[in-house]
């Protein structure tokens, strides 16, 4: 599913639907009232959250989904497959400080020297792939 904060573009805008070849209609979307606050709902349901931010001390390839508690200081249930939500911000400003703080982990994508950022879609694709192969 995709959780959208109030500042996100409309995923059902005509051009979005067209460039996604209609696949946007197959992905569940949720409109959050307040992203930092609504992340607690994910945590309450056992879903850990990883904020992608270039300033994170940990690199994405170092994140072990099985070692992430659903909330900071929480316990880890090793009997279940880890459930992780990747949290990304807008291109340019990135995530807000309150959103980064609300996440249970922070990670950065390692990039070549001189590259300071990635397109949000590219960053998310890399993160989802990395977490999938890490399982």
What do the predicted segments below correspond to?
Residues 1-135:
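Post-transcriptional modification and biogenesis factors for structured RNAs
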């Amino acid at each position: 599913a995709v959780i959208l904060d109030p500042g996100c573009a409309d995923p059902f805008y005509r051009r979005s639907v067209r460039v996604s070849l209609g696949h946007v209609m197959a992905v569940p979307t949720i409109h959050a009232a307040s992203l930092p606050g609504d992340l607690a709902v994910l945590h309450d349901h056992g879903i850990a959250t990883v904020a992608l931010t270039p300033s994170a001390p940990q690199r994405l390839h170092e994140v072990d989904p099985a070692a992430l508690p659903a909330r900071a200081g929480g316990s880890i249930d090793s009997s279940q497959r880890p459930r992780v939500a990747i949290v990304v911000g807008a291109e340019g400003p990135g995530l807000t400080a309150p959103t980064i703080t609300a996440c249970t982990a922070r990670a950065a994508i390692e990039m070549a020297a001189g590259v300071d950022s990635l397109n949000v879609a590219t960053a998310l694709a890399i993160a989802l792939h990395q977490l999938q192969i890490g399982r």
